[in-house]
Every structure is written in structure tokens, then in C-alpha cells.
């Protein structure tokens, strides 16, 4: 639904409107507020809420609000009228009344009807969309319009854009803070949640702020690989992803910490980290998901064995490896995580796959075998593949190896990963709930 509440009041009713907004501040904070000149200033000064002001009533502010009703951006109008002592210069309600009737917008004209309107709005869920405008290769404006088209009829949608200057996790944490404050002051009927729209980096960054909060995460994938969405069975097309959110069915899944960095998918040591580094932004923009295949072929020619000390739940093993993958969740295309044939994201355990191919030919055989395991959902039977489980794992290597976590290079070994069971609430398709 539309995200704005319009506030108008005759002179003798301005104080009553300001006090009403103050009394229901937690609900009004979930919406964008727009008000005629002096009314908006009074509400802003008394409540501390952000209010966009249009012209005053005598200068046509009510007409500006009427235009927004026609545009479909107004969720409700609260216009406290003075039926006995209205002044000639004050706004006339008749135009707004006609438009609200035509466009089916709730209109309150006194405190009693205002209470009824906010009770209705209080039952509407608010989705805070964190939208990455540089993700993927599609038409960004069209994608955003498509999201609005599928979500705004069901929820109050508030949009935040990511930027290179601000950490996406910090953006999400600020929204989490506002949601918690609003929930503490409300009856909880209109719960809020956060939606991440972008690639795996955006999704991981937003999810990091939601771990162990209970606030649901919706995902609208628009990246190159969209690995987390694929792993959880979330549709990778915008209409399907929005439908999953609108259905409101949630699932609690595991997450992990990798060197104290939140992790949704997996940590790769050796081959996978080098491959991801080679598949840079320019290559992904040009080739899409094929960038990873191209980079993988290139890395297969260069990858060398390294010595690895692997400690799983306090038990240590030393071996030679070319790739070590520690997975919380992984799609079939993350072949180096497929030692068991599939990765569970609800069992409270990490899946560890170690590959130890010594030649490019052996490496190709390992990749083929692991991909077959993923398709058949059966464990690998290749002699150069070892699969293990554990709640926590620590890896040290000689020489040090690069580490990739959820598609981002974070440094070099040693690396320590701990599973956080049932720590993230996500909107999931019916079959995965």
C-alpha cells in the first residue's frame, strides 16, 4: 500500500492533531508523513518525527495533497475539521472527500474516525526495502517499479538505497533499531520486517544485522549468482520472490560466524577464494554467472596444494589440500561445498569439504564428481574428496591462503567458523517452510 499519511487541520484543531500524533507516535513513525505548512511544522516540533510540508491551506496545500492521492502515494488522510468555526481561508474538505471516495483512501475528519484509521493502519505490515541500485545487469528502474507493483498492494513499503559510502549492515542495523523501538510502543499487530534486494553481498550484509533479532528477512535476488536464494529455494525472478514475501511464511535457518564476520553461505580457502577474486566486477558485468566458470578454469591451471591443519570440534587433522570449503548453506553450483551431495541449513552443523587434487586433470575430475553429487544429492566417492561435519572448525595453512566469505575476500588464513543454529528468520516458499 502507499507509504504516506497526510495531515491537515483547521486552526482550532491543530493542537488536537499534534497531540493525537504524539499519542500514536510509534505507528506514525512507520509511515512517511506529509502535512500542510503550519500543521506540519507543529507536528515536527512536538513529536520529532520527519514531516514533509507542502504549502499552507490558504496557498493550496490541500490541492497538493489531492494530487498525491491521485498519484496513489497516500495511504490515509487525517483532516481534523472545525464544523462550527471554520474560517473562510481554511481548506475545504469537499475536494479531498470526493478524491478519497474515488481512490478508496481512508479519510478521518475527527478524533474518533482518526482512531479507526490508525487501527486499520496498525494492522498493516511494514517492509523496509534495502535496494542495491548497482546489483546485477538488469534495468534498475524497471526492477524497482516491478517490486513496488507486487508489494505495495500488500504492505507499507519504505525504501532505502545502498551506496558505496555507507556499509549496508549499518543501514540495516539502523532500521532494526527503529523497528524495535516501534514494537516496544505498539501492540505488535503490524509487525515490520526487512527486505534485501541485490546480490549475495547485499543479502549477507543485511542478514548480518538481523541475526538473533527475530525480525524476518525477505529476499529479492538481483545479483549475478544469487547463491543464497537458490540454496533456500527462493525464486530468483522478482514476481516470485515478492509472492514469497506476500505469503508471509517464515523459516528459521542457521547462520555462522567466520573470523567473527557473519556468514550465510560458505567460507572458501584456496581454490574458491582465488576463483572469486578472479571473477571481478567487470568480468561479472560482462559475463554474468559465466564469469565464475571462466575464472574457475583459469584457477584450475594455477592452483597448488597447501598444507592444512583442520580442527573440528577440538579434533585436529593435518593433510594436503587444494580447496577447503566450510558451508552453512550452498546451492548446487557451489560445487566445492558438495562433498555430502547437499548442504543442510537447519541442522546446526557446518559441512566441510576438502579437495586434494594434485593435477589439473584431477581437479577437473573432482569438480565433475562434486557437481554430479550435487545433482544426485549423494555423497562424493572421489578419492581426492573428504567430507566432514562439525559445529565449529578452525583451519591454519602453510603457506597462508586467501579466504572468501559469501563472495567477498576477507583476508588470509587462519580461519575459524562457528555455526549459529536457528539464528535467522526468513520468508521462504511453502515447500521449504
Swiss-Prot record:
One Gene Ontology biological process: phospholipid biosynthetic process
Organism: Synechocystis sp. (strain ATCC 27184 / PCC 6803 / Kazusa)
GO-annotated cellular components: cytosol
CDD domains listed in its UniProt record: MGS
A Pfam family the protein falls into: MGS
Superkingdom to which the source organism belongs: Bacteria
Region described as Methylglyoxal synthase: 1-126
GO MF annotation list: ATP binding; kinase activity; methylglyoxal synthase activity
Domain DAGKc: 127-262
Disulfide bonds: none
InterPro entries: ATP-NAD_kinase_N (IPR017438), Diacylglycerol/lipid_kinase (IPR005218), Diacylglycerol_kinase_cat_dom (IPR001206), Methylgl_synth (IPR004363), Methylglyoxal_synth_AS (IPR018148), MGS-like_dom (IPR011607), MGS-like_dom_sf (IPR036914), NAD/diacylglycerol_kinase_sf (IPR016064)
Active site annotation, chain numbering: 62
Full protein name: Uncharacterized protein sll0036
Residue ranges occupied by any MGS-like domain in the UniProt entry: 1-145
Family to which the UniProt record says this protein belongs: In the N-terminal section; belongs to the methylglyoxal synthase family.
Amino acid at each position: 500500500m502507499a507509504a504516506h499519511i497526510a495531515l491537515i487541520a483547521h486552526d482550532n484543531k491543530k493542537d488536537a492533531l499534534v497531540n493525537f500524533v504524539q499519542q500514536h507516535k510509534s505507528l506514525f513513525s512507520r509511515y512517511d508523513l506529509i502535512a500542510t505548512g503550519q500543521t506540519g511544522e507543529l507536528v515536527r516540533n512536538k513529536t520529532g518525527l520527519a514531516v514533509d510540508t507542502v504549502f499552507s491551506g490558504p496557498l493550496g496545500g490541500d490541492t497538493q495533497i489531492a494530487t498525491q492521492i491521485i498519484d496513489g502515494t497516500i495511504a490515509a488522510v487525517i483532516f481534523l475539521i472545525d464544523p462550527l468555526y471554520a474560517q473562510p481561508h481554511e481548506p475545504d474538505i469537499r475536494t479531498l472527500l470526493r478524491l478519497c471516495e474515488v481512490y478508496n483512501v481512508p479519510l478521518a475528519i475527527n478524533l474518533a474516525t482518526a482512531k479507526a484509521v490508525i487501527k486499520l493502519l496498525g494492522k498493516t505490515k511494514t517492509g523496509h526495502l534495502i535496494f542495491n541500485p548497482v546489483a546485477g545487469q538488469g534495468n534498475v528502474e524497471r526492477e524497482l517499479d516491478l517490486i513496488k507493483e507486487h508489494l505495495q498492494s500488500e504492505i507499507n513499503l519504505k525504501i532505502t538505497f545502498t551506496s558505496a559510502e555507507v556499509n549496508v549492515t549499518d543501514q540495516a542495523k539502523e532500521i532494526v533499531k527503529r523497528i524495535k523501538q516501534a514494537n516496544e510502543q505498539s501492540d505488535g499487530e503490524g509487525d515490520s520486517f526487512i527486505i534485501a534486494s541485490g546480490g549475495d553481498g547485499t543479502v549477507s550484509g543485511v542478514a548480518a544485522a538481523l541475526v538473533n533479532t527475530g525480525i524476518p528477512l525477505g529476499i529479492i535476488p538481483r545479483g549475478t549468482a544469487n547463491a543464497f536464494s537458490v540454496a533456500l529455494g527462493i525464486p530468483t525472478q522478482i514476481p516470485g520472490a515478492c509472492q514469497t514475501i506476500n505469503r508471509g511464511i517464515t523459516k528459521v535457518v542457521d547462520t555462522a560466524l567466520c573470523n567473527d564476520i557473519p556468514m550465510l553461505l560458505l567460507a572458501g580457502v584456496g581454490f574458491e577464494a582465488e576463483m572469486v577474486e578472479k571473477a571481478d566486477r567487470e568480468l561479472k558485468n560482462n559475463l554474468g554467472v559465466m564469469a565464475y566458470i571462466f575464472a574457475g578454469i583459469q584457477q584450475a591451471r594455477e592452483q597448488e596444494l597447501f598444507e592444512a591443519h583442520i580442527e573440528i570440534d577440538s579434533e585436529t587433522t593435518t593433510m594436503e589440500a587444494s580447496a577447503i570449503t566450510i558451508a552453512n548453506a550452498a546451492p548446487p553450483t557451489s560445487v566445492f561445498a558438495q562433498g555430502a551431495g547437499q548442504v543442510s541449513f537447519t541442522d546446526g552443523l557446518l559441512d566441510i569439504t576438502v579437495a586434494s587434487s594434485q593435477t589439473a586433470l584431477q581437479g577437473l575430475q573432482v569438480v565433475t564428481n562434486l557437481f554430479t553429487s550435487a545433482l544426485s544429492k549423494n555423497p562424493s566417492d572421489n578419492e581426492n574428496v573428504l567430507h566432514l561435519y562439525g559445529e565449529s572448525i578452525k583451519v591454519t595453512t602453510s603457506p597462508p591462503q586467501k579466504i572468501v566469505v559469501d563472495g567477498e575476500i576477507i583476508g588470509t588464513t587462519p580461519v575459524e567458523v562457528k555455526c549459529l543454529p536457528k539464528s535467522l528468520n526468513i520468508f521462504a516458499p511453502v515447500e521449504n517452510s
